[in-house]
């Protein structure tokens, strides 16, 4: 309990890192490289670029198609955290806990970044709790994100 402030700060930093990282990756995929590049172009860059042709296409994807790739990216980190919690002593876990909180929240928010993005393109039928979080800018609001898809800001 004495390190709760460290854990809270670490958790918030994990969320901010995920938010910044996802924005940076989106910007980089929109800006650099060619969709003709082997593997990366077809599997990574093309979906980002096609999203700007049909921004609402993401709303027609199921949960796995929307979030699966991002969840897969986080598995090594979540696996490492699981290993720490099952193999470290209580003292070692307590020493590592703020960093573990950072990694966990960063991983979870990386995993759901496409879901949050999908909600920013969904105009009907969102749960009230999602709308509240959008209205208070806790997650990406629809009106704010729309600017990204309209010239001259389109990237």
Question: PLM ranges: what are they?
Answer:
Residues 2-8, 96-99:
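Membrane-interface helix-boundary signature
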Residues 13, 17-155:
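Membrane-embedded catalytic scaffold of the fatty acid hydroxylase/desaturase
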């Amino acid at each position: 309990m004495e390190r709760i402030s460290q854990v809270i700060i670490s958790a918030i930093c994990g969320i901010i890192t995920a938010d910044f990282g996802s924005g940076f990756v989106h910007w980089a995929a929109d800006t650099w490289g060619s969709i003709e590049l082997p593997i990366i172009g077809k599997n990574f860059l093309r979906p980002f670029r096609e999203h700007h042709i049909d921004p609402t296409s993401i709303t027609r994807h199921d949960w796995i198609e929307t979030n699966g790739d991002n969840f897969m990216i986080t598995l090594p980190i979540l696996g490492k955290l699981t290993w720490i919690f099952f193999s470290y002593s209580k003292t070692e876990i307590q020493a590592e806990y703020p960093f573990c909180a950072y990694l966990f929240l960063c991983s979870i928010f990386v995993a759901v970044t496409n879901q949050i993005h999908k909600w920013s393109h969904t105009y009907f039928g969102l749960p009230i709790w999602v709308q509240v979080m959008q209205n208070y800018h806790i997650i990406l609001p629809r009106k704010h994100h729309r600017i990204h898809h309209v010239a001259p800001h389109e990237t």
